[in-house]
Amino acid sequence: MEVIPAIDLLDGRCVRLYQGDYQQSQVFSENPVEVARQWVEQGANRLHLVDLDGAKAGKPVNLSAIEAIVRAVSIPVQVGGGLRDRSSVAQLLNLGVNRVILGTIAVENPQLVQQLSQEFPGQIVVGIDAREGKVATRGWLETSEVQATELAQNMAHLGVAAIIYTDIHRDGTLKGPNIPALRELATAVNVPVIASGGVSSLTDLLSLLALEPSGVTGVIVGRALYTGEVDLSEAIQAVGQGRWQDIPPDLGSSAFA
């Protein structure tokens, strides 16, 4: 399972929000590029960037920080936040971003999601952010009547590369992922699902391994990395590729004596 560090950008700085509340932001670094490099050094294979200003504005805002991070690291970078038209998506992909994450337009303009998935195959991911099973939009400032699982099925049919599922009530809270909701969603679709929100410990990450057969292929970790509750290199060793439970024991010659 892929462990993906999150870097949330607000005013060019690396922050974390509590349950998506912009009034409850905590600055973790003035230099997001250094943060990105740190996660790469600890073994990250992918970075997850969220343009929080962009999510509110409905268009990319932290472009200079995003471009600087993409240039500074040699691993794929995925970006979400405020991507609501083709030009914004193309702009980020032209900067060297590997995958873009669409949220609001998945609810408001599914036809555009289909067009983008066809134009940029493998590079369009849909972020489904849910409050009590219903999809939130516009930087989590609004909640729709659309059910998360229903939207996930529609998006899978449209050809998206993956779905990121965030439980808003758990995001930034360190209360653990919503395992039942993740299982329901992953079982309902045939595209990879990435879990996001609430991871607080290695135990939480290990609990997600049970969902791998259902199609949960990755997990985004934010606050727990910044507070030190989760050590990235340890997490990758525990649940990532080549994790200890996948490695056969070294029997040694004595086993055959």
UniProtKB/Swiss-Prot annotation:
Keyword Nuclease: no
Enzyme Commission number(s) from the entry: 5.3.1.16
GO biological process, one term: L-histidine biosynthetic process
Any one GO CC term of the record: cytoplasm
Subcellular location(s) of the protein: Cytoplasm
Reactions this protein catalyses: 1-(5-phospho-beta-D-ribosyl)-5-[(5-phospho-beta-D-ribosylamino)methylideneamino]imidazole-4-carboxamide = 5-[(5-phospho-1-deoxy-D-ribulos-1-ylimino)methylamino]-1-(5-phospho-beta-D-ribosyl)imidazole-4-carboxamide
Gene Ontology MF terms: 1-(5-phosphoribosyl)-5-[(5-phosphoribosylamino)methylideneamino]imidazole-4-carboxamide isomerase activity
Domain of life of the source: Bacteria
Active site: 8 (proton acceptor), 129 (proton donor)
Cytoplasm listed as a keyword: yes
Keywords: Amino-acid biosynthesis, Cytoplasm, Histidine biosynthesis, Isomerase
Enzyme kind, highest EC tier: isomerase
TM segment ranges: none
CDD domains the UniProt entry points to: HisA
The protein's annotated pathway: Amino-acid biosynthesis; L-histidine biosynthesis; L-histidine from 5-phospho-alpha-D-ribose 1-diphosphate: step 4/9
NCBIfam families per the UniProt record, alphabetical: 1-(5-phosphoribosyl)-5-[(5-phosphoribosylamino)methylideneamino]imidazole-4-carboxamide isomerase, PRK13585.1
Family: Belongs to the HisA/HisF family.
Name this protein carries in UniProt: 1-(5-phosphoribosyl)-5-[(5-phosphoribosylamino)methylideneamino] imidazole-4-carboxamide isomerase
